[in-house]
Amino acid sequence: MAQNFTKLNPQFENIIFEHDDNQMILNFGPQHPSSHGQLRLILELEGEKIIKATPEIGYLHRGCEKLGENMTYNEYMPTTDRLDYTSSTSNNYAYAYAVETLLNLEIPRRAQVIRTILLELNRMISHIFFISVHALDVGAMSVFLYAFKTREYGLDLMEDYCGARLTHNAIRIGGVPLDLPPNWLEGLKKFLGEMRECKKLIQGLLDKNRIWRMRLENVGVVTPKMAQSWGMSGIMLRGTGIAYDIRKEEPYELYKELDFDVPVGNYGDSYDRYCLYMLEIDESIRIIEQLIPMYAKTDTPIMAQNPHYISAPKEDIMTQNYALMQHFVLVAQGMRPPIGEVYAPTESPKGELGFFIHSEGEPYPHRLKIRAPSFYHIGALSDILVGQYLADAVTVIGSTNAVFGEVDR
């Protein structure tokens, strides 16, 4: 028997794309290379100035939240890699942190050290990727080439640790899957030196570059009031002068023990945001240099010990009958967290990334909601772009550092 489906009309089907001599409506993206394949903007122009901007999203929607409600808690971890795929370790950690808060797990100190190192390494890789792609959007191609070369060294380190370069899956609920490989920290120290040199090179190319500054200064200005009303976070918020960083406000892992600063901007424009990304690379280097000596002082366990939720070490599974049975139950049926709900915020490279989980005591979350920073920053384009020139739209979009894997989810 044939089924009848309701036909949905496109949202902008009846728009007349040309007005009078002074005004017109322009369709920007999703095919435009600077929309990164998934953003569509309906821009109303008066001359070359934007008087209205309407973002349309959803081209990368995959139902990630619903997938999480139909997978066991451990099964869902690799899916989080596909949210912000330029900083997948941050996604892994944010999800694991929410589940661990729900389970009230105590994470071994060595696992905390490794996690914090990976998070800051991941932050540097993400920031240098943003700077390279943003420079390419504006026309500074040489920066893209230098930055990508340095980024490769960081990806090599991630590959040495977890076997993957992009979708890392490097965090587990309760700890980390592996200890650091031999000589990995020596490679990390070399990478920090490479990052410092690359940063100096990029600053030499851009900071006093007249064209770069003209394209970014006083372009895409965000006021503190606008940032708060749109729920912005991360560098989009700190660029307005508001010093809010979840690593300081609600510290997790070892951030409470670490000495680092939260750089803020003065004007809230695209150039301020570029400067903050560069300054945050310095802070990540500073954090990792404090963590490296901490690693040697820690004991060997890298996973929490709780037989109700976490499998025993592999050696015990291979030699002890009870550990094998417990492992079988956790893999075949999944863990059953207590009834309750939790929201756990983290500071990802883009801003506040948090997972809300509502548990009914089943192996699957009853409700899983992802609070992704890029979603709010793309929505704010309807305010930020008004009054900008059409030629500056690409600069403004790029300076939000939005990734559509976490916008559409």
UniProtKB/Swiss-Prot annotation:
Lineage: Bacteria, Pseudomonadati, Campylobacterota, Epsilonproteobacteria, Campylobacterales
Name of the protein in question: NADH-quinone oxidoreductase subunit D
Major location category of this protein: membrane
Bilayer topology annotation: Peripheral membrane protein
Family annotation (Gene3D superfamilies): Cytochrome-c3 Hydrogenase, chain B (1.10.645.10)
One GO CC term, this protein: plasma membrane
Keyword annotations of the record: Cell inner membrane, Cell membrane, Membrane, NAD, Quinone, Translocase, Transport, Ubiquinone
Superkingdom: Bacteria
